[in-house]
């Protein structure tokens, strides 16, 4: 597996991975999946990719992208789902379904955390459904709950990068 920096050319793949992350539960009814994918707020996570504060990594197998992890800064006026503050980038991460549960997500997460620390960020944040298996990966990486959203269905989590 190769891990490389995300570039402008990865915009389409990042968008795909964003929707994979948003529609993470294969047991959801079709209507809920469609609603999640149609949420205009998701566009905030990839529109104008490459602006200041954006960074990401892509996992490749045989030169094909199989996963991505990225972060973006948000503002108080236009926060993301996992917004903590304007100095803490919010991350997104997803792996192509065929390649899940092989350690790719954890490798991407660790690489992105190193990159964020090297860029001078003190922490990263995210939003995750409480029942999403990925939550355990985030906890292993040092993410801790900051608050609950949607009546406890989602957690906003934060990890210090120190």
What role is predicted for each listed range?
Residues 90-101, 128:
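A short, internal acetyl-CoA/4′-phosphopantetheine-binding micro-motif in the GNAT/acyltransferase core
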Residues 52, 60-93:
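Conserved acyl-donor/pantetheine-binding loop and adjacent beta-alpha core of acyl/acetyltransferases
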Residues 43-58:
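A short helix-loop-beta-strand connector motif used in the catalytic cores of GNAT acetyltransferases and
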Residues 101-114, 139-140:
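Conserved acetyl-CoA-binding loop-helix of GNAT-fold acetyltransferases
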Residues 22-46:
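Conserved GNAT-fold acetyl-CoA-binding loop/helix
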Residues 2-16:
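A short beta-loop-alpha structural element at the N-terminal edge
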Residues 116-129:
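Conserved GNAT acetyl-CoA-binding A-motif
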Residues 139-148:
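Conserved acetyl-CoA-binding loop of GNAT-fold acetyltransferases
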């Amino acid at each position: 597996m190769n891990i490389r920096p995300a570039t402008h050319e990865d915009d389409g793949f990042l968008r795909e991975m964003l929707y994979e992350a948003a529609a993470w539960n294969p047991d959801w009814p079709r209507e809920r999946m469609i609603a999640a994918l149609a949420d205009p707020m998701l566009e905030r996570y990839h529109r104008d990719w490459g602006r200041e504060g954006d960074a990401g990594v892509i996992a490749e197998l045989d030169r094909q992208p199989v996963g991505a992890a990225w972060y973006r800064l948000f503002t108080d006026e236009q926060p993301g789902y996992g917004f903590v503050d304007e100095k803490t980038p919010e991350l997104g991460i997803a792996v192509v379904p065929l390649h899940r549960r092989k350690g790719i997500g954890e490798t991407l997460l660790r690489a992105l955390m190193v990159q964020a620390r090297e860029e001078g960020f003190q922490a990263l944040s995210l939003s995750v459904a409480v029942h999403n298996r990925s939550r355990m990966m985030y906890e292993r990486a040092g993410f801790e709950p900051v608050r609950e959203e949607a009546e406890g269905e989602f957690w906003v989590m934060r990890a210090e990068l120190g």
